[in-house]
């Protein structure tokens, strides 16, 4: 059995994700490492692009401990065939050549063939797609973003993830493989 992550929302709803370690082992390990430390708890969802995705964070969940990059999953594991990105998946965001975010998951709201092999699918939603579609429709406002051409809209009323609860099915997961060096995206400003 695969591990699961349950996102408990402040409105009483929940989103349950089956994690897919066979499809994206390092990405799953990274998500588990961050969620297991509680760094995703009490977080306001930061970016909603209707018709495209619900992006939980682009600032490493406001935790320095989450502000690390991991290698492209399919460079690290070339034997794995990337999964298709579509509604019902959860993917890990990233920063191009710099690498993948250690923990900046997003839920696609459309088929995203351009993500295959770039932003790994590391889980599938097994409960709570109605909540993801509700989030797509909340009122948002545009916010400045340091990367030209990237649309960032945050909810007018905060949509809070109260906590993320992991069920690892009795397995242990090691810390993720991280990118060497100290390059960081412009969005990770903790000063």
What spans do the regions from the language model cover?
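Cyclophilin-like peptidyl-prolyl cis-trans isomerases
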Residues: 1-191
């Amino acid at each position: 059995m695969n591990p699961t992550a349950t996102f408990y929302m402040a409105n009483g709803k929940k989103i349950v994700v089956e994690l897919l370690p066979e499809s994206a082992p390092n990405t799953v390990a990274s998500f588990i490492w961050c969620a297991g430390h509680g760094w995703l708890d009490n977080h306001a969802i930061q970016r909603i692009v209707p018709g495209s995705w619900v992006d939980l964070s682009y600032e490493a969940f406001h935790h320095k401990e989450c502000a690390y990059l991991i290698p492209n999953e399919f460079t690290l594991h070339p034997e794995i065939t990337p999964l298709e990105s579509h509604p019902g998946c959860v993917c890990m965001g990233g920063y191009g050549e710099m690498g993948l975010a250690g923990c900046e998951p997003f839920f696609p709201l459309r088929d995203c063939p351009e993500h295959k092999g770039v932003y790994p699918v590391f889980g599938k939603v097994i409960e709570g797609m109605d909540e993801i579609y509700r989030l797509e429709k909340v009122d948002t406002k545009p916010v400045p973003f340091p990367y030209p051409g990237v649309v960032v809209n945050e909810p007018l009323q905060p949509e809070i993830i109260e906590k993320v609860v992991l069920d690892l099915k009795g397995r242990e997961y090691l810390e993720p493989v991280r990118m060497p060096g100290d390059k960081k995206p412009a969005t990770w400003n903790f000063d």
